[in-house]
Amino acid sequence: MSNQKALVIFSGGQDSTTCLIQAIQIYGRENVQAITFQYGQRHAVELERARWIAQDLGVKQTVLDLSLMRQITHNALMDDTAAIETAENGVPNTFVDGRNALFLLYAAIYAKGQGIRHIIAGVCETDFSGYPDCRDVFVKSMNVTLNLAMDYDFQIHTPLMYLTKAQTWALADEMGVLDYIREQTHTCYNGIVGGCRECPSCILRERGLAEYLESKKAV
């Protein structure tokens, strides 16, 4: 695949950084770009991490401003004063309606202009937080929609879709970057450097790491 190019939807978190490093290994650094979205997220430190990691890995990064989302939707992920809770339907109030649909749309528009067909997203439905737009059925339908909308053969890849968080840590270890992911990425919804250990994202991350390290010791 060295003659093909890929665009990674990149937040600076554990999953997207794992995907970015994997893409570099598959396609070659010179063939990989990252696209990052500023949408008013309360964990803005994530954006700082994304910029640093992209620069450190030598990957071109494009940052798009989608903060207009604040004008049309409200959720705990974009409101510093809101408590993070889970609704009766099981969906946390950190869910941003339409976020991944918008991310994929804008990523596709950018990718086509760059002659890129491969779009990579770190979404996962195994150990996910109950977000409907992290499901494989959504991504596949979006892939078809974008191909039809732009008459272009996009291929959306979700390498973590069926991996547990423990398996995602294992993948990072296999690529030789477990410590890098552990020390350099940011996942906390509350924007606390090093993690708050209380929000759903921190809990998933820490639980997965503990499970992986425990299984590694048992081998």
From Swiss-Prot:
<protein>
    <recommendedName>
        <fullName>7-cyano-7-deazaguanine synthase</fullName>
        <ecNumber>6.3.4.20</ecNumber>
    </recommendedName>
</protein>
<keyword id="KW-0479">Metal-binding</keyword>
<keyword id="KW-0436">Ligase</keyword>
<dbReference type="GO" id="GO:0008616">
    <property type="term" value="P:queuosine biosynthetic process"/>
</dbReference>
<feature type="binding site">
    <location>
        <position position="202"/>
    </location>
    <ligand>
        <name>Zn(2+)</name>
    </ligand>
</feature>
<dbReference type="InterPro" id="IPR018317">
    <property type="entry name" value="QueC"/>
</dbReference>
<comment type="similarity">
    <text>Belongs to the QueC family.</text>
</comment>
<dbReference type="GO" id="GO:0016879">
    <property type="term" value="F:ligase activity, forming carbon-nitrogen bonds"/>
</dbReference>
<dbReference type="GO" id="GO:0008270">
    <property type="term" value="F:zinc ion binding"/>
</dbReference>
<keyword id="KW-0067">ATP-binding</keyword>
<feature type="binding site">
    <location>
        <position position="196"/>
    </location>
    <ligand>
        <name>Zn(2+)</name>
    </ligand>
</feature>
<keyword id="KW-0862">Zinc</keyword>
<keyword id="KW-0671">Queuosine biosynthesis</keyword>
<dbReference type="GO" id="GO:0005524">
    <property type="term" value="F:ATP binding"/>
</dbReference>
<comment type="function">
    <text>Catalyzes the ATP-dependent conversion of 7-carboxy-7-deazaguanine (CDG) to 7-cyano-7-deazaguanine (preQ(0)).</text>
</comment>
<dbReference type="Pfam" id="PF06508">
    <property type="entry name" value="QueC"/>
</dbReference>
<dbReference type="InterPro" id="IPR014729">
    <property type="entry name" value="Rossmann-like_a/b/a_fold"/>
</dbReference>
<keyword id="KW-0547">Nucleotide-binding</keyword>
<comment type="pathway">
    <text>Purine metabolism; 7-cyano-7-deazaguanine biosynthesis.</text>
</comment>
<feature type="binding site">
    <location>
        <position position="199"/>
    </location>
    <ligand>
        <name>Zn(2+)</name>
    </ligand>
</feature>
<feature type="binding site">
    <location>
        <position position="188"/>
    </location>
    <ligand>
        <name>Zn(2+)</name>
    </ligand>
</feature>
<feature type="binding site">
    <location>
        <begin position="10"/>
        <end position="20"/>
    </location>
    <ligand>
        <name>ATP</name>
    </ligand>
</feature>
